[in-house]
Amino acid sequence: MILMSGQMEQYLFHRGEFRQAYEYFGAHPTRSSTIFRIWAPSAKSVAVVGDFNDWRAREEDYCHKLTNEGIWEVEIKKIKKGNLYKYQIETSWGEKILKSDPYAFYSELRPQTASIVNGKPKFRWADKRWLNNREIGYAKPINIYEVHLGSWKKKEDGTYYNYKEIAELLVEYMLEMNYTHIEIMPIIEYPFDGSWGYQGTGYYSVTSRYGTPDDFMYFVNYFHKNNLGVILDWVPGHFCKDSHGLYRFDGSACYEYEDPSLGENEWGSANFNVSRNEVRSFLLSNLYFWIKEFHIDGIRMDAVSNMLYYKDGLSENKHSVEFLQYLNQSLHEEYPDVMLIAEDSSAWPLVTKYQADGGLGFDFKWNMGWMNDTLKYMEQDPFFRKSHHGKLTFSFMYAFSENFILPLSHDEIVHGKNSILNKMPGYYEDKLAHVKNLYSYQMAHPGKKLNFMGNEFVQGLEWRYYEQLEWQLLKDNKGSQDIQKYVKALNKLYLEEEALWYDGQDGFEWIEHENINENMLIFLRKTPNMEDFIIAVFNFSGKDHEIYPLGVPLEDGEYEVILDSNEKKFGGSYQGRKRKYKSIKKSWNYREQYIEIKIAKNSAVFLKYKK
């Protein structure tokens, strides 16, 4: 039976503008049959095989070719939700290969690779209030907890929690710790656990490791009901080469470049050929799929620099640049309240500027330069830090050139790079003090915040995707307990103080940045309200200061310590009343008055002006 052609859908698909391709392609159950559609431009024939025909194509299982550009379609009776299937594709030279459905909504658990007839999930959402109030968050606190679902926490028998179970555990923990968003590492279906999801192939199929599409909808809905946002890690640049997937889908370079110099990358995966309109529709539609069907609040696009440049790292990929601009603009037209975040390690300009101004149109960009420079500085013994002072101050030179997120991500605690704790110099107690200083500096620096799971209680080991976090440290290790308490207090301070998340260029002002010998750094974070500001003071040296003078903006009133990383309750040495300082009428740091504060070695102090 030849079905209606769907000419508008085909037209948009071949133009690279089909936002709802997933509603046309893939497997779509009806009351008595299932309709299959697939794009395989170089195939001689296409059939659907599965558990319903013992994986042998019958005459009625063969597809009809709808367009010269390679859209195939068939309606098969008595196939229902839950049936396994693949496409049997005959290549141009006559070989028959089996492929999973690129548009499948659900897939078998690895190592099995069949697609599962599922249809679009019918979930009863209860997050209307959240969606109605959702916005990008330029002028709001954004404090992201980056999570790998398979290794955050496991059951006692070592198996995974499903999406529903882990949602409730994560929400309780994140609310307690004062985070605002979760960022989930990729959950498209992927064959190899060790790729962490970054080498996937089932772009429309939420990984079955942790449950069903309905389960994941429950996950997002539960977060929204508890006023927490959900950001999804998405990989639009490359995909795995496993034989059942997108690679050489119809025997030819279908989704990837034919030329290996364009199609290969450092990870051994294949780059999407976004100069091809049908590939553009596949990715454009996939972005809409996650946002429309799963109510995702933000998309973090992985490895954007791999898209912007060819393999040599020098030649610009103009097709990718144009595609990213189109992708971001299209999405913002329909979903202006969804965050688009670039993980870009290059120096490409205007990443978060409008397309009309030559920008790529992202809302935020990971500040990889800040992360690398800051960690290199913190790894130095305090005695040698004065030779590296510029690594702390340089990021302020470009802090407002883009809308930045400051990441301390999973990439920095794997492959021999050490955990955050063990990057720090000195004995254990010294390391803990350095970690608190690092986190304080991140929180005070202009930009939104992101931390990888486990950073908040300083795991000793690097992250291992196959094991849960070292939760036992919170039972028997005082250092981990102290750091977790401090991160909780720091996150709370960030949420409550607009001066820390108001990221306009007028929201920052230096007080002292040239005291290289003392390893001191002092600056203001402020709001447009002249009296609403916080002074952040950092002592990155190994020297205590009983009296340290610093210039302040206003003469009247008091300057109260609202957080001190050296407090006893956080594992420090200071125990006493909250300190308040009155200004002294004398010029200091180019200001007409100053205060004298006490600050311990390797510590941070936050002061708030009280009239």
Swiss-Prot record:
Protein name: 1,4-alpha-glucan branching enzyme GlgB
This protein's record includes keyword Glycosyltransferase: yes
Catalyzed chemical reaction(s): Transfers a segment of a (1->4)-alpha-D-glucan chain to a primary hydroxy group in a similar glucan chain
Oligomer status and interactors: Monomer.
InterPro entries named in the record: A-amylase/branching_C, Branching_enzy, GlgB, GlgB_N_E_set_prok, Glyco_hydro_13_cat_dom, Glyco_hydro_13_N, Glyco_hydro_b, Glycoside_hydrolase_SF
SUPFAM superfamilies assigned: (Trans)glycosidases (SSF51445), E set domains (SSF81296), Glycosyl hydrolase domain (SSF51011)
Gene: glgB
Metabolic or biological pathway, per its Swiss-Prot or TrEMBL entry: Glycan biosynthesis; glycogen biosynthesis
